Amino acid sequence: MGKVNKTDREWQRELSPEEYRITRQKGTEPAFTGQYWNTKQHGTYVCRCCGAELFSSDAKYDSGCGWPSFFRPLNGSVIDEHEDLTHGMVRTEIVCHDCEAHLGHVFEDGPQPTGLRYCVNSASLQLKTQEKNDEGTYP
């Protein structure tokens, strides 16, 4: 896809106020309130800002934290990591590689096979649902 460069004004026109606050101003939605924290639908989670494919529903799990959680991204090049020292903590922020939208944080307390928990704001995501094929399975 390539890098996406837009002005703040362009992002404000394209996103809801909540999406803008979270993705462009590094906000966080309250736990257990986002659209995808408890969804079980199959598909691909894409960046709300630029549409880059980020996570598969196959890697989503219930971490109990109140935000959508994944144990791995679709591939290692879709997400960038930055040190986050805000709120008196040391955390690892995750952002979309293509547009630098704030997604959430990654923690080292996830399940196997990675041991990682990508904790993502629903407002940073959009789910492209997937239907079962003729055999009754997901492609």
From Swiss-Prot:
Concerning SUPFAM superfamilies, the annotation shows:
Mss4-like
GO CC annotations, alphabetized: cytoplasm
* Amino-acid positions noted as binding Zn(2+) in the UniProt annotation, renumbered to this chain: 47, 50, 96, 99
Key word Oxidoreductase present:
yes
Q: Does the keyword Zinc apply?
A: yes
Keywords from the UniProt entry: Metal-binding, Oxidoreductase, Zinc
Cofactor, how bound (note): Binds 1 zinc ion per subunit. The zinc ion is important for the structural integrity of the protein.
Please name the GO terms of the biological process aspect recorded for this protein, alphabetically: protein repair; response to oxidative stress
Q: Coiled-coil stretches, from where to where?
A: none
Q: Extract the Pfam families matched here.
A: SelR
**PANTHER family (UniProt xref):** METHIONINE SULFOXIDE REDUCTASE, METHIONINE-R-SULFOXIDE REDUCTASE B1
Per the similarity annotation, which family is this? Belongs to the MsrB Met sulfoxide reductase family.
Q: What is this protein called?
A: Peptide methionine sulfoxide reductase MsrB
Species name for this entry?
A: Acinetobacter baumannii (strain SDF)
Q: Which gene underlies this protein?
A: msrB
